[in-house]
């Protein structure tokens, strides 16, 4: 675990979370490693581990692995559909190609456990980064911990082996660089480099660019409006941050797909209507859910404390808060975004908590607790067998050997969330659909899929695509219908999966 460095050597001892004043150099180094702030960081890390120690069942990861395999083996980018029989050869751009590679190499080396470890490492780094941002904002390690503890609960919405995590890691890095610039520590030259990486790991770069634009714009005005204030950039600051903004936009085009990758987030937002309206994580936030209640509580606490304490807010802080809250309310997947953005603001309002005092720190007790938590995490590290058992509950794992041996002579209609798993593990079976919804929505396939599983016109869709086999969840309306429809028989069935075959000729 990395310690949080002191913002200024002249600060009073009570504000320096990692600066014990007594002892030799070796003793001071040891005390930093087992100090109370580090203990709090380990508690946060253990909480993340507890929430995230069960599974890797994200439907996208499987086709991400196949894409990375194509890149590594052929040294060329995937530029069209290679896996389906419904949209074969259709143009497609892999907007997460760079963030797929760590998962792929870990999977090659350690299998499903490698996927879990890469996922866990990214989430831990994000949460530690949020904890650091909260401390920089509040200068109070206890306030930072309380706010970050709440953030972990919101972040669970995106726990899984997802390329999105790399995007949130880039966001944390951006916020750190912007904070430094506002505080007079100019490392803004790193921002174009950051966006050059970000555009190749995930489409969430567009959020970072919006926040960057807000940050630049907030320094173009000067004034005070009640408790809202704006401080104008100096001419040197304005020139520097403006130049970095231009270079960051230009850096977005440093990708294998050039402008296609830059336009992808806008295509998703404005053209992929079925995708947005039918995929669960794109649904509006449910305030009956625990995460919804926590988000509301964090927002309410931030606002109420700000009113009671009469603190002034900078323009960019208010706008950042509005962007985060609106995004999370509109699309539940952005709860992680809200966790990252809201935590430093809440921590700032909690800075009335007693500050950390290294003179009364219990270093040996901290060390004992840290070792106990790390040992517990190591002891309960999920095995490959445990991860595999969890996969069996959600994917047609047991059916794969049967599909490979059967030598299917016809097209297969499959569950959307199983498509990626089939792409990786049943390569002799071209899929009907998978979770790359964008390519299937453009071709009209996703609309037909919804008609089939919604029992609007299931038999007509199966006939339209000349389907011989249906591989689907055991307990679903479609499987119930086919069980009671003449012309279909069951070839295979287990606790998760049913494989139907059409009796007679295919239309």
Task: List PLM regions with ranges.
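Transmembrane-helix motifs of polytopic, lipid-linked glycan transferases
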Residues: 117-137
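Juxtamembrane membrane-water interface segments that cap and precede transmembrane helices
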Residues: 93-105, 263-297
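Short hydrophobic/aromatic helix or loop-helix immediately within or flanking a transmembrane segment
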Residues: 86-113, 117
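Luminal/periplasmic acceptor-recognition loop/helix of membrane-associated glycosyltransferases
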Residues: 413, 430-475
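Membrane-interface alpha helices of multi-pass inner-membrane proteins
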Residues: 151-155, 176, 188-203, 247-251, ...
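Membrane-proximal, lumen/periplasm-facing interface regions of secretory-pathway glyco-
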Residues: 359-406, 417-419, 426, 435-437, ...
């Amino acid at each position: 675990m990395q310690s949080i460095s002191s913002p200024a050597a002249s600060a009073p001892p009570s504000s320096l979370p990692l600066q014990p004043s007594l002892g030799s150099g070796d003793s001071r180094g040891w005390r930093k490693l087992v100090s109370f702030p580090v203990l709090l960081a380990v508690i946060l890390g253990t909480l993340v581990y507890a929430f995230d120690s069960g599974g890797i069942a994200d439907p996208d990861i499987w086709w991400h692995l196949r894409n990375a395999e194509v890149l590594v083996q052929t040294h060329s980018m995937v530029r069209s559909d290679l896996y389906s029989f419904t949209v074969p050869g259709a143009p497609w751009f892999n907007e997460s190609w760079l963030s797929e590679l760590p998962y792929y190499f870990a999977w090659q080396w350690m299998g499903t456990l490698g996927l879990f470890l890469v996922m866990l490492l990214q989430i831990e780094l994000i949460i530690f980064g949020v904890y650091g941002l909260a401390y920089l904002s509040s200068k109070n390690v206890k306030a930072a911990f309380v706010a970050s503890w709440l953030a972990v609960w919101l972040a669970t919405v995106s726990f899984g082996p997802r390329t999105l995590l790399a995007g949130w890691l880039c966001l944390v890095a951006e916020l750190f660089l912007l904070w430094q610039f506002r505080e007079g520590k100019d490392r803004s030259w790193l921002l174009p480099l950051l966006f050059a990486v970000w555009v190749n790991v995930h489409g969430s770069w567009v959020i970072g660019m919006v926040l960057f634009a807000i940050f630049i714009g907030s320094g173009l005005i000067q004034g005070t409006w009640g408790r809202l204030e704006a401080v104008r950039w100096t001419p040197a600051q304005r020139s520097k941050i403006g130049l970095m903004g231009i270079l960051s936009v230009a850096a977005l085009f440093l990708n294998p797909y050039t402008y296609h990758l830059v336009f992808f987030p806008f295509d998703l937002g404005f053209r992929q209507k079925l995708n947005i309206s039918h995929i669960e994580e794109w649904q509006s936030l449910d305030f009956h859910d625990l995460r919804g209640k926590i988000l509301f509580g964090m927002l309410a606490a931030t606002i109420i404390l700000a009113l009671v304490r009469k603190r002034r807010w900078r323009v960019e802080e208010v706008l950042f808060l509005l962007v985060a809250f609106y995004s999370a309310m509109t699309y539940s997947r952005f709860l992680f975004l809200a966790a990252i953005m809201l935590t430093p603001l809440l921590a700032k309002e909690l800075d009335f908590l007693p500050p950390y005092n290294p003179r009364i720190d219990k270093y040996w007790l901290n060390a004992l607790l840290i070792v106990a938590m790390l040992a517990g995490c190591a002891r309960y590290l999920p095995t490959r067998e445990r991860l595999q058992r969890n996969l069996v509950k959600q994917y047609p794992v047991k059916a794969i050997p049967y599909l490979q041996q059967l030598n299917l002579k016809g097209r297969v209609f499959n569950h959307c969330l199983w498509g990626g798993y089939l792409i990786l593990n049943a390569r002799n079976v071209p899929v009907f659909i998978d979770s790359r919804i964008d390519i299937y929505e453009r071709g009209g396939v996703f609309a037909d899929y919804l008609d089939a599983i919604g029992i609007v016109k299931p038999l007509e869709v199966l006939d339209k695509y000349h389907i011989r086999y249906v591989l689907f969840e055991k307990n679903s309306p479609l499987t119930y219908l086919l069980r009671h429809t003449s012309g279909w028989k069951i070839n295979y069935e287990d606790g998760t999966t049913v494989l139907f075959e059409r009796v007679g000729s295919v239309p």
